[in-house]
């Protein structure tokens, strides 16, 4: 199973840290953006190619730093239409060539369309509020259900009570029973503790979460979860993040 490959890769890397790739054109260095504008003219094409170069540099950083996985935000590229989809495909191919586990954050409700194509990533994220249909069984691929989001109005739905638990917990339990990983974006230890208590065997993907708040997600051997960091830009950033995580979580 693909989830088992991910956990094996994290154990091999001796770190639960993954690199999040969600660039905006504003992050691209001005000289680099200007270079593409001089070649291609101002507009979406130049911006998209600048994003491609920038994202490939981040992927190279993950490879050189020995990280096991990357999580790519589809929304960073798909607004550019077919050009953005091409960049996204290039990143998935490059991650595969570098033997980096690649998850694309599509937040789709129909993951089969993305996981059965020729250039499919190792896993995708889904929004589970359509029910179990968003967690199909696809050989050697993983699905991660985004059950707890950090957007301002997320709690309007996620905190509704379903029986004796919040709706996000009820959905997480259903998705976990189908073999999905669970995505938590809030960074709050209480959310992490509750999901780990209710879903003891589920793999948790934690975004915007420091080592202290992430600790409840891991077992005594440092297994069972992954922390995604979107702020890493240099090798020293990665090493600092690894060291900080290791103060709380050690993979055996």
Task: Annotate the PLM regions.
Residues 24-25, 37, 42, 110-181:
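Conserved anion-binding
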Residues 79-94, 110-113, 128-141, 187-199, ...:
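Active-site-adjacent beta->alpha loops and helix N-cap segments on the catalytic face
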Residues 218-252:
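C-terminal functional extensions of proteins
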Residues 16-20, 68-71, 101-103, 122-125, ...:
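Structural preference for beta-strand elements that scaffold enzyme active sites
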Residues 1-87, 96:
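Conserved N-terminal beta1-alpha1 strand-loop-helix module at the mouth
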Residues 48-62, 110-118, 168-169, 213-216:
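Short, acidic/polar
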Residues 64-120, 153, 189-192:
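N-terminal active-site wall of soluble small-molecule enzyme domains
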Residues 52, 182-232:
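A C-terminal functional module that forms or caps the active site or interfaces directly
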